[in-house]
């Protein structure tokens, strides 16, 4: 068995996911976080001081006129990229040149990464199940391997972010698992490029959600949430846990989905703000979002039919996603808004549905076609927007395509970019 195959098997054993390279590769959901809505002054987390602390958990340019000027131009990002890296370390090591070229060519106002998979700082020699003293916005730094990860991040993503005018914020798990990061475009860039006229600095950043509609500063234990409040909209980036194949993982995912629906309903009711929810939501809503519907639906029979099938396309997950779209006055799947499901695609015979697929299976070691999921894929990465934003959806670009994952930049997920028209 190859080193890659061993690593894949080890992750599956540790995380309880379905055998093989299945989307998401985990079935854990975080425990419900306690409410904590008090403002903090702990400073934005840094990586060895590379990103300067801004004094509070606010991201701003320091210009007293920037927010008001931006609000006049819409008060929020017009271009957002979401990308499940399938490991920050591997992408920064093996695919940095193509990832850097992608970020330079597509200078989005906000870039959202999932599966960043770098460990959070804790007390010296802490074990992976030890939450003591965890600083989830900073990298673990007490071993030579940790310091190597920090050096890698500094010379790649952090260096590029400074040049392009981004702040880098992270939310990390205890070990190389899950985790998220964002690049937020600001207007105090070293090279004077400045923020574009159609965007603005973020107002505030949060790291978890509650079922009653609150954004909170305390990080999700597995680093699955980063939410950014702009003057006129809130962007919530999520890495949703995989449904798994065991009853306990079904229950955890059901709880996660319930909390998310509660958050959307409560937040919109309380604030009236426009929402964009993006990231790896780990669900293919309809058969049109699967390359091989019959194959996926025939996988992993469960005691309850509602939980039978490949994680990501079980009846229970699809039903809950439909309920999410009805939450908060209604959310619009931006890709499907522009690309409605054709009647012919609804049945979804094998290999028929290929457009918009965001996750693709891995090729076999010796023969590509021997890979369990090779040639198969799902659309599980999304931009869900409030109905009031639907008229502004200009484009949702899925950069990757095909069984051989062209444009996937080394990941098993494709990057996506949402472009919004200017507000009237």
Model-derived segments and spans:
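Surface-exposed cleft-lining segments at the edges of enzyme active sites
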Residues: 207-216, 240-257, 261-264, 307-309
């Amino acid at each position: 068995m190859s080193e890659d195959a061993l690593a894949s098997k080890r992750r599956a054993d540790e995380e309880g996911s379905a055998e093989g390279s299945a989307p998401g590769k985990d079935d854990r959901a975080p425990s419900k976080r306690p409410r904590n809505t008090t403002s903090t002054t702990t400073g934005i987390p840094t990586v060895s001081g590379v990103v300067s602390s801004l004094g509070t958990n606010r991201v701003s340019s320091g210009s007293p006129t920037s927010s008001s000027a931006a609000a006049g131009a819409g008060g929020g990002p017009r271009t957002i990229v979401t990308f499940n890296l399938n490991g920050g370390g591997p992408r920064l090591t093996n695919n940095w040149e193509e990832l850097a070229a992608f970020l330079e060519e597509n200078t989005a106002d906000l870039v959202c990464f999932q599966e960043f998979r770098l460990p959070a700082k804790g007390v010296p020699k802490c074990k992976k199940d030890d939450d003591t003293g965890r600083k989830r916005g900073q990298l673990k730094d007490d071993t030579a391997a940790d310091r190597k990860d920090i050096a890698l991040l500094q010379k790649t993503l952090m260096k590029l972010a400074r040049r392009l005018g981004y702040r880098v914020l992270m939310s990390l798990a205890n070990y190389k698992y899950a985790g998220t990061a964002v690049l937020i475009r600001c207007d105090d860039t070293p090279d004077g490029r400045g923020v574009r006229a159609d965007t603005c600095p973020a107002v505030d950043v949060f790291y978890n959600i509650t079922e009653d509609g609150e954004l909170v500063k305390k990080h999700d234990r597995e680093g699955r949430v980063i939410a950014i409040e702009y003057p006129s909209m809130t962007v919530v980036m999520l890495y949703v846990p995989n449904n798994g194949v065991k009853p306990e993982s079904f229950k955890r995912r059901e709880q996660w989905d319930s909390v998310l629906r509660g958050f959307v309903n409560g937040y919109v009711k309380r604030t009236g703000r426009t929402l964009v929810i993006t990231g790896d939501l780990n669900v293919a809503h309809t058969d049109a979002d699967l390359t091989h519907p019959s194959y996926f639906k025939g996988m992993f029979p469960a005691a309850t039919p509602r939980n039978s099938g490949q994680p990501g396309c079980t009846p229970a997950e699809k039903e809950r996603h439909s309920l999410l779209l009805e939450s908060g006055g209604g959310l619009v799947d931006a890709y499907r808004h522009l690309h409605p499901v054709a009647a012919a695609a609804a049945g979804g015979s094998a290999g028929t549905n290929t457009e918009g697929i965001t996750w693709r299976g891995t090729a076999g070691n010796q023969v590509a076609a021997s890979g369990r999921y090779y040639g198969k894929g799902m659309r599980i990465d999304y931009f869900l927007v409030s109905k009031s934003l639907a008229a502004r959806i200009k484009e949702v670009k899925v950069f990757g395509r095909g069984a051989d994952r062209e444009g996937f930049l080394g990941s098993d997920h494709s990057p996506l970019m949402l472009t919004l028209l200017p507000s009237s």
